Regions:
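Electropositive phosphate-/nucleotide-binding environments in soluble metabolic enzymes
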Residues: 9, 13, 33, 61, ...
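NAD(P)+-binding Rossmann beta1-loop-alpha1 motif at the extreme N-terminus of oxidoreductases
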Residues: 1-52, 59-62, 89
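Rossmann-like NAD(P)(H) cofactor-binding subdomain of soluble oxidoreductases
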Residues: 60-69, 73-148, 165-167
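Internal alpha-helical scaffold of NAD(P)-dependent oxidoreductase catalytic cores
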Residues: 82, 93, 121-131, 148-197, ...
Length: 332
């Protein structure tokens, strides 16, 4: 199968390496020309995935028209806030893309202002194509190194082709499941970044394992409540796109969102951390989007609300914890 991966951050690069390992034809298209030149010359993404060389079978591209002409599947590996711009760029080069059957997003976040999920943004800009979301508990470097993992591919309007893509993505080191609950896996993948910031705050405050376990348990309950209120299926959040992604991102030392929260718990300011970060901390903007949605819909989300106060009102993490611990008592 022929894949085009647009976006050469850590995850886009890692997934390109995975596809190459499965002997697919794959072209990596960095969004910046200078990045494309750097990767082509060194065969390594030194900015986002250092130490992991790209196999020679991976093609590097920058001109979209010839890449899209050959692609069966386009994978958009860019941050959620850059997704619309990337889709508009793709749209301008789709005239000869006669083989394209599916566009898949790897983004985990909501578009600021519209509160749209990644697949909704893609569908708004590229309405003539089937759209899917690929998500789950995956660290980019581990996938690139071929360590075993599992993901879930959610899509509609694909028919039998979805199972073909599922088989093409799966291999000895990656098992891919499918679902039609696109909303569920996208809400799960987005919300877990918010709760990873909370988990990081707990780590930064050195509160221990009991606190982390309680936090993750209540975060999962809140994730289900928010997701179902927004139209997702409850059972989706107990799978790879919900609970699985939540556990990995809230406990992994590699997690940008958890690390961001840890520094907050240690006393750093969000603005300083964001200014110093080379990679996108998706949970920061996602918190703002979900806080707005929950307020509009009257959804009870106390953990999310306290993270919003930490990030946007400067509330000390220790005070946010006290607010959560002293809420009215209730049945589980």
């Amino acid at each position: 199968m022929n894949f085009a991966v647009i976006g050469a951050g850590a995850w886009g690069t890692a997934f390109t390496i995975h596809l190459s390992r499965l002997n697919h034809t794959v072209t990596l298209v960095p969004r910046r020309f200078e990045q494309a030149l750097a990767i082509a010359s060194t065969r390594e993404n030194t900015d986002y995935l250092p130490g992991l060389p790209l196999p020679l079978s991976i093609q590097l591209g920058h001109e979209l028209t010839p890449v899209l002409m050959e692609a069966d599947v386009v994978i958009l590996a860019c941050p959620s806030q850059a997704l619309r711009e990337t889709c508009e760029r793709v749209r301008a080069h789709l005239g000869l893309a006669t083989q394209l059957k599916l566009i898949v997003s790897l983004a985990k976040g909501l578009e600021l202002g519209t509160h749209l999920r990644p697949s909704e943004v893609i569908a708004a800009v590229l309405p003539d194509y089937a759209v899917g979301s690929l998500t789950g508990p995956t660290n980019a470097a581990e996938v690139a190194r071929g360590k075993p993992a599992a993901m879930v591919l959610a899509a509609t309007r694909t028919g039998a082709f979805l199972t073909e893509v599922q088989a093409a993505l799966s291999g000895p080191t990656l098992r891919v499941y499918t679902t039609d609950d696109v909303a569920g896996v996208e809400f799960g993948g987005s919300l877990k970044n918010v709760y990873a910031i909370a988990a990081g705050c707990s780590d930064g405050l050195k509160l221990g394992d009991n606190t982390k376990a309680a936090l993750l348990t209540r975060a999962l309950a809140e994730m289900v409540r928010v997701g179902v209120a927004l139209g997702a299926k409850a059972e989706t959040f107990y799978g790879l796109g919900g609970f699985g992604d939540l556990v990995a991102t809230c406990t992994g030392a590699w997690s940008r969102n958890r690390t961001f929260g840890q520094h907050l718990g240690e006393g750093a300011k969000a603005s300083d951390l964001l200014a110093a970060s080379k990679s996108v901390v998706e949970g920061y903007r996602t918190t703002e989007s979900f806080a707005g949605l929950c307020k509009e819909r009257g959804i009870d989300a106390p953990i999310l609300g306290e993270i919003h106060r930490i990030l946007y009102e400067g509330k000390p993490p220790a005070e946010a914890l006290t607010a959560l611990m002293t809420r009215e008592l209730k049945r589980e």
